UniProtKB/Swiss-Prot annotation:
Residues 124-135, 300-311, 322-336 have a biased composition (Low complexity). Plays an essential role in the regulation of neuronal differentiation and migration during development of the central nervous system. This is LIM/homeobox protein Lhx5. Residues 151-167 have a biased composition (Basic and acidic residues). The gene is LHX5. It comes from Homo sapiens.
Amino acid sequence: MMVHCAGCERPILDRFLLNVLDRAWHIKCVQCCECKTNLSEKCFSREGKLYCKNDFFRRFGTKCAGCAQGISPSDLVRKARSKVFHLNCFTCMVCNKQLSTGEELYVIDENKFVCKDDYLSSSSLKEGSLNSVSSCTDRSLSPDLQDALQDDPKETDNSTSSDKETANNENEEQNSGTKRRGPRTTIKAKQLETLKAAFAATPKPTRHIREQLAQETGLNMRVIQVWFQNRRSKERRMKQLSALGARRHAFFRSPRRMRPLGGRLDESEMLGSTPYTYYGDYQGDYYAPGSNYDFFAHGPPSQAQSPADSSFLAASGPGSTPLGALEPPLAGPHAADNPRFTDMISHPDTPSPEPGLPGTLHPMPGEVFSGGPSPPFPMSGTSGYSGPLSHPNPELNEAAVW
C-alpha cells in the first residue's frame, strides 16, 4: 500500500520520510509556510499548516504594543500594565531614551511613553490621556496633574492661588463625568511620615522646603505641593466639622432648664399683676400651717370681692384662738368706713388680748398662733418689707394684728 504525503498528497517513494502530526511527509514538504524554510528539528503548526519558530511567534504570539509585531520567546521584553514591549520599543517618545525597569513613566495613547523628566518639563502633552506606571504599590495619591502641566515651570509660593486652582479642577471634574483622571502617584509609608512631619512643622511650605522634601522622599515637587494642598483642605474641613459638632453639642446639652420647685422665682413670674406679696427662701422662722398672718396691698379691698378673693383668713385651722375670727383692720383714714370692720369697732365688749387703752392696736406675738417666735420683720404701717423677704415692695403697707 502506498503512503501519501500529508503536504502534497502524493505517494512517498523516498527512502526516508518524516512523521509530523501523526502523518507521513516528504522531507522536502516539511517546511514553513511563510518563509519556505525546511524544518528538520522542530516545527510549529496551526490549522494544519507548519511554521518555523520565528514566524509562528511573529504571527500568533504576543504582539509588541509599540511596533505591533510578534515577540519571540527569546526576546527580552518590558511590561507596562497589560502591555508588552520590545526593548527597542520601550523608549521615551521625546528623548528616545530606553526606560529601565522600575522607572516612573507616563503612558500616552496606550502605546507611547514619556519619561518623568520630559513629562514634567513639557507643556504640549496636556491634551493627551495620561496613565502612569509605577513600581510601588503601597499607598497612592491621585492629584490632577493634567491641568498642572503648565503650572510646573511657573510654580510659585502662592499657596492661596494653588488652592483655588485645585478647587476649580475639582469642580470641572464633577461637571464632566467623562473626563479621565490624571496619573496616579504612589507614596510609600516612609515618604508619608516625612510629609506628615513637615506638615506639622509648616502647613504652607515654601519652594525651598518643597525642594528639600523632594530630595528626601524622591517625589515630584508638584506631587508634594498637591499633597500639602489636600492636607490643608482636609484640616479645614475637620475644623469646620468640629466647630459644628461643638455648637450642636452645646445646643442639645444645655437647653433652658426648668427651675426647681424650691428655687427662686422672679416676682413678675410668680405674682404677675396681683397685689399680694410673696415669701421667698427665708431661712429663719417660718409660719406654721394654719397661721393667721396675712398681708395685703395698700388701700381697702372693694366690696365686690368675696371672702375667698380677699386676704382675710378665717380662724378655723389649728392655729385659731379663742378670740374667734381675727381680721386685721386696714391702716389709713378710710379704715372705719369699711363695712368689714364696723362690727368689730362698734362693739365695746369685744375681748382684747391684753389690757390697754380702748381703740389702741397692739401687735400680738407669733407664739400665740404658731407656737414659735414671730417672723423677724418690723410692724410698721408705712414702710415696705425688707430683710429676709424675697423682694421689697414700697407700695405694700402692713396692718397690725390685734
